[in-house]
C-alpha cells in the first residue's frame, strides 16, 4: 500500500535516533510516507525534515501558531508578537500585541494578503492586519471567561468571510460574522463526549471542505469531526489505542488524503508527539522526537506549504 502524503516522517529504519516511524497496524513499514513539517513547541520552533532532522530554527521557542508560506517564508505567532521571517531570518512582517491585552494566540496569512491574529485579554478580539502592520478589521470575541490564556487559540477565517474561533473554557466553537455576531455555536461538552467532566476544551477548529468542522479537544484527549448541526460524525481518542497517543492534543491538520495529523503537546520522553491517523483510526505515521508541540503544519519534502487544511 502506498500513500502520497505531505507530513511528518516516521521511518524507524531511516533514523532511529530521531524516532521517526511509518508503519501499519501490523508493524509493517508503509512505503511512501515521507514528510517534513513546521512545528511550534515549548523548546523548538522551526522546520524538521522527513528524516526527523532540524533544518531551520526560528531562533525563538515557545511559538503559538505558524505557517510556511508559498514563497518559503515562515509566519509565526508568539505570545507577544507575530513575525514573518525569511529563511535567512530577515523580518518582512511584524505585529506586536496591544498594551492592553495579555497575549496573542493565532496567526494565518489570508488570501487577501492580510494576516489573521487573535489578541487575548481584557479586550479579546480577532484582527486582520495588512502588510504594513495596520489593523484593517477588528472583530470582538465572546470567550465567556476573563482568563486570557484560555479565551481562544487557533482561529481561522472561512471561505464565506466569517471567522471560526475555539473558546476553551466556554466548551464552544463559535462562528462569527465580520461584525462580531455569533452565527453558529458548536458545543464540545456533549454528553456523548463525557460532558464537562471530560474537560473537552476546544483548541483547534478547522472548517473542512465537506462543511464539517474538525476540533481538537485538549484535556479531553480526543479529536472530533462535527457536522453543521454540531453532531459528532467521527471521533478518535485514547480509547481506540493501547499506547495512549493523545496527550493534551492541540494542533491538528486534515491532509488531502483524508488522514488527520494530531500534535500532542504534553507528550514527553519517548511518547508520540505527532501522529497521522486514517478515517478508520489506524495510525500510519508517528514522530517521537522532541518534546510535545502546540501545533505542526505538514509540508512537502522541501518544507513548502501542504494543500492540507491546518
Whereabouts are the PLM-identified features?
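Bacterial N-terminal signal peptides
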Residues: 4-17
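Sec/Tat signal peptide C-region and signal peptidase I cleavage site
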Residues: 18-22
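Histidine-/acidic-rich catalytic cores in large beta-rich domains
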Residues: 23-310
